[in-house]
């Protein structure tokens, strides 16, 4: 799957479009199909929904250490930390596209799970490498309506 996403990113870079928005929309479509594969049911509680999206849905794409937590300062915002982002691991971004996160496709998958349960959301991927975790990605999940 990483090879496919790498090809999509290369194509989108040639088009000079909004790559992250395009990756999110592609991820949304992939997420809908993955929801069908894992028999995803509508969840009412946001904490249960985020848990299932993180450990049931995303485990179909990659198997890495993940953690979900509520943001301390901001209301209706959650942080999903992926210690080894699948697409960040295999795709290197040129220097001129420094802020680009190849894991934006996962944002669309998370949004699909939230939308399937009736939650409108905005998900953003931030690469946060550290010395021990060079491919760590933090997904900021903002619930727009409750």
From Swiss-Prot:
Domain of life: Eukaryota
Biological process per Gene Ontology, one example term: endoplasmic reticulum to Golgi vesicle-mediated transport
SUPFAM superfamilies: Ligand-binding domain in the NO signalling and Golgi transport
Stretch forming the signal peptide: none
Keywords: Endoplasmic reticulum, ER-Golgi transport, Golgi apparatus, Transport
Entry keyword Endoplasmic reticulum: yes
Function: May play a role in vesicular transport from endoplasmic reticulum to Golgi.
Descriptive protein name: Putative trafficking protein particle complex subunit TRS31
Species of the source: Encephalitozoon cuniculi (strain GB-M1)
Designated gene of the protein: TRS31
């Amino acid at each position: 799957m990483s090879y496919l996403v790498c090809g999509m990113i290369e194509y989108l870079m040639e088009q000079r479009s909004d790559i992250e928005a395009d990756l999110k929309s592609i991820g949304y479509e992939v997420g809908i199909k993955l929801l069908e594969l894992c028999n995803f049911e509508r969840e009412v509680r946001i904490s249960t929904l985020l848990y299932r999206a993180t450990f049931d849905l995303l485990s179909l794409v990659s198997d890495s250490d993940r953690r979900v937590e509520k943001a301390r300062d901001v209301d209706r915002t959650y942080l999903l930390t992926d210690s080894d982002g699948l697409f960040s691991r295999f795709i290197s971004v040129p220097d001129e596209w420094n802020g680009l996160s190849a894991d934006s496709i996962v944002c669309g998958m998370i949004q699909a799970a939230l939308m399937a349960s009736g939650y409108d959301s905005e998900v953003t991927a931030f690469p946060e490498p550290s010395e021990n975790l060079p491919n760590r990605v933090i997904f900021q999940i903002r619930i727009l309506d409750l």
